[in-house]
UniProtKB/Swiss-Prot annotation:
Gene: NPF5.1
Main location per the UniProt record: membrane
GO BP annotations, alphabetical order: response to nematode
GO molecular function: dipeptide transmembrane transporter activity; tripeptide transmembrane transporter activity
Name of the protein this chain belongs to: Protein NRT1/ PTR FAMILY 5.1
Annotated membrane topology: Multi-pass membrane protein
Residue stretches spanning the membrane: 74-94, 99-119, 134-154, 182-202, 210-230, 320-340, 361-381, 405-425, 446-466, 485-505, 529-549
PANTHER family assigned to the protein according to its UniProt record, in alphabetical order: OLIGOPEPTIDE TRANSPORTER-RELATED
Native organism: Arabidopsis thaliana
Length: 583
């Protein structure tokens, strides 16, 4: 009994596969070695993403639509590739080794990108700020560098945050409390990296050189990796399950379809399930029956012709299906976020960016206000909002995960509505001063864009952190790395969706010689219409989210019941049952 208190209770092991002592491994001690990497990786990513649209238009001579599309496509790839990285980690080599291999690919991509903007033969020549057209070789090398980074991110992004969460034992009441704050502070370190990128790196890129602007985060990544490996003795590792998760997920709907003509028993106890001792002795989690997606229950009907699926296997499939419904309604919010590094930046380049008489703020640096609002909001959320709401609701998180997402989505809609209103104001100034040239500065301060940036940052404290925690918490235990890719892939597809939308909107509105809403000359476009279009589809999407959330049943978790005195799960279930607005 004493030994059970000394060793971790969730079955985590060290790198050699041996049980680990709870007192000497994991928790915040281990996570401290991971936070540095997250900060430098985000600094590298946002150092590229926040100013990439300007590099593509000014150095590689791409037009507005092409540059926005290429930024979205690359960002989308960065967020989509984690699906492969998570699957490899969960099914084959684990999070640590997947991260190790992928981080080296990431660093290689950063080195290649730094070469692409510094080596004379690999970059276009420029004189007095005007660059010659890049050769096919130069463009190809540049994009190879970018997509090498995307491949590396595929293995690092889904595994580093999940690996951090693994450092907290879900069977320990004390450590489970600590995990509640983990994702908030994990994202806080991410925001720090993004802040340095949008404030420091963007300025360095435009004033001291792109090579230095990309070289600094490359060196930072290398240093953070060294720090990461110094912490190896303190890390806890989840044991890789040998089950074929993809096969199991496909097997359930196939079996349910084959049994479609059979009558499902009224009593779920008549469905096929293994003894609980089997799960305990094999280190697996038994999942109890839930009254949702009842058509899948037919896969567990006992028949003489074939071996049925277990209730646990069916419930895992139900859980993934429920996550998919929530995931689908996160795509539009991700499309709104895609504006920050694309159209918001291009919008900013048309405005007066002077501070004082000499200093001119880079348009992409306004993205730092997204990060600043996040940095200010995370401690307030964690230290003030959560304790206050916890007293009101009895929920350890203050509000449910889906309520958190709903608040974030609503704030995003307000932000994009304000962006549309500011663009209307900009067009009035353009008309008043008879501005027609795309290079002519609109006599309107760039700080008019501050509200839309700041609100998106505040919304992200609810939205981004909430999504990451939701998909990790609600995923089946055996596929939590893969579960976090619901978060990353949603962002990725949101970027691809924005790429598709700007392309189609441009084609439709410019058809027959009409004026494109998103033309090369933003001083003669209707960006306000595009933002208004995003507001409309976001409101429709919000309605779909409320409906999907009202139908969602949270994962049953005996440990959560113990942690909250039996109130957490029951409270969330009642909230879902009483009102479709209580999500």
């Amino acid at each position: 009994m004493e030994a059970a208190k000394v060793y971790t209770q969730d079955g985590t092991v060290d790198l050699q596969g041996r049980p680990v002592l709870a007192s000497k491994t994991g928790r915040w001690r281990a996570c401290s070695f991971l936070l540095g990497y997250e900060a430098f990786e985000r600094m590298a990513f946002y150092g590229i993403a926040s100013n990439l649209v300007n590099y593509l238009t000014k150095r590689l001579h791409e037009d507005t639509i092409s540059s926005v599309r290429n930024v979205n496509n690359w960002s989308g790839a960065v967020w989509i590739t984690p699906i492969a990285g998570a699957y490899i980690a969960d099914s084959y080599i684990g999070r640590f080794w997947t991260f190790t291999a992928s981080s080296l690919i990431y660093v290689l991509g950063m080195i290649l990108l730094t070469m692409a903007v510094t080596v004379k033969s690999l970059r276009p020549t420029c004189e007095n700020g005007v660059c010659n057209k890049a050769s096919s070789l130069q463009v190809t090398f540049f994009y190879i560098s970018l997509y090498t980074i995307a491949i590396g991110a595929g293995g690092t992004k889904p595994n580093i945050s999940t690996f951090g969460a693994d450092q907290f034992d879900s069977y320990s009441i004390e450590e489970k409390k600590q995990k509640v704050s983990f994702f908030n502070w994990w994202m806080f370190s991410s925001f720090l990296g993004a802040l340095f990128a949008t404030l420091g790196l963007v300025y360095i890129q435009e004033n001291l050189g792109w090579g230095l602007g990309y070289g600094i985060p490359t060196v930072g990544l290398l240093v953070s990796l060294v720090v990461f490996y110094i912490g190896t003795p303190f890390y806890r590792h989840k044991v890789i399950k040998t089950d074929n998760l993809a096969k199991d997920l496909v097997q359930v709907p196939i079996a349910a379809f084959k049994n479609r003509k059979l009558q499902c028993p009224d009593d779920h106890l008549e469905l096929y399930e293994l003894d609980s001792h089997y799960y305990k002795s094999n280190g697996k989690h038994q999942v109890h029956h839930t009254p949702v997606f009842r058509f899948l229950d037919k896969a567990a009907i006992k028949t003489s012709s074939r071996v049925p699926c277990t209730v646990t296997k069916v419930e895992v499939a139900k859980r993934v299906l429920g996550l998919i419904f929530i995931w689908l309604v996160t795509l539009i919010p991700s499309t709104l976020w895609a504006q920050v590094n694309t159209l918001f930046v291009k919008q900013g380049t048309t405005l007066d960016r002077k501070i004082g008489s000499n200093f001119q703020i880079p348009a992409a640096s306004l993205g730092s206000f997204v990060t600043l609002s996040m940095l200010l909001s995370v401690p307030m959320y964690d230290q003030s909002f959560v304790p206050f709401m916890r007293k009101k609701t009895g929920n350890p998180r203050g509000i449910t995960l889906l309520q958190r997402l709903g608040v974030g989505f609503a704030i995003q809609i307000v932000a994009i509505a304000i962006a549309s209103a500011v663009e209307v104001k900009r067009m009035r100034v353009i008309k008043e001063f008879h501005i027609t040239s795309p290079t002519q500065v609109v006599p309107m301060s760039i700080f008019w864009l501050l509200p839309q940036y700041s609100l998106l940052g505040i919304g992200d404290v609810f939205n981004a952190i909430g999504l990451l925690e939701f998909f990790y918490d609600q995923s089946p235990e055996e596929m939590q790395s893969l579960g976090t890719t619901f978060f990353t892939s949603g962002i990725g597809l949101g970027n691809f969706l924005n790429s598709f939308l700007v392309t189609m909107i441009d084609k439709i509105t410019s058809k027959g010689g009409g004026k494109s809403w998103i033309g090369n000359n933003l001083n003669d476009s209707r960006l306000d219409y595009y933002y208004g279009f995003l507001v409309v589809i976001s409101i429709v999407n919000m309605g779909l989210f409320v409906w999907a959330a009202s139908k969602y049943v949270y994962k049953s978790d005996d440990d959560t019941k113990e942690f909250s005195g039996g109130g957490c799960v029951q409270m969330e279930a009642k909230a879902l049952d009483t009102s479709p607005l209580s999500i």
